[in-house]
Amino acid sequence: MTDRDVEWFKRCHAAGLIKGRMLEVGAARIKGDPNLCDYARQLGVTETTGADLDRYDGVDVVADFGLSPEAFNAQWQLDRFSTVCVFNVLEHTFDPVTVLTNCVSCVEGGGRLLVVTPSVWPLHSYPGDFNRLLPDWYVTFAKRNNLELLEKHFCWLSEFGIETISPTPEPTLPSFLSRRNASPLRYWVSRTGHKLLNTYGRSHWATCSAIGAAFLRR
């Protein structure tokens, strides 16, 4: 989990998207780092549950979200949650549609589903690295599952900051040009410096970027 992921999570909390009981899918603490349940409790969320494939540190419930929906519902013993968070999990699943569909089934009516996945990222096989999901995938998933994709919280998370993904005319990857509006002084000082020193310049596109998507279950 990156600092940008945590920043987006805190923005969602400030916007009132994280209420009531919260479930984190993929909650194992890696190398002792905090998981989302930890951050949520720091923000005042009192009821948090962590789920993962095995009994690791930070995991309260062992569950396989990769099962067919029928098999998953048969094994799932908990009530639905007001908020379900799935951060940096789907890229490690061979069938992200099934996994996220099972996550949706854990969200109560009127609840929120918060998802973060890398879109441009180095390979990281833990245990496998299978896919990179892009904006159109999220838009289509919402339509097929009767979810509302909350446009204000549908964002690129990158070295250039957090910026809303515009669905029209067509989504584009985050670029340093976006900082021209967000940080104009820094943008022009940096660009002038590269020109004066005749450097190779900076990367036009984010070398690492992720997508944060918030859904409302109708």
What is the predicted function of each stretch?
Residues 12-13, 40, 142:
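Hydrophobic, Leu/Ile/Phe/Ala-enriched alpha-helical segments that form helix-helix packing faces
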Residues 94-218:
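S-adenosyl-L-methionine-dependent methyltransferase catalytic module, highlighting the catalytic core
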Residues 1-19:
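Class I SAM-dependent methyltransferase Rossmann-like catalytic core
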Residues 5-11, 34-35, 197-199:
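Short alpha-helical segments and helix-capping/turn motifs at coil-helix boundaries
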Residues 20-124, 136, 213-215:
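Conserved SAM-binding loop
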Residues 3-6, 84-93, 164-172:
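N-terminal short leaders/motifs
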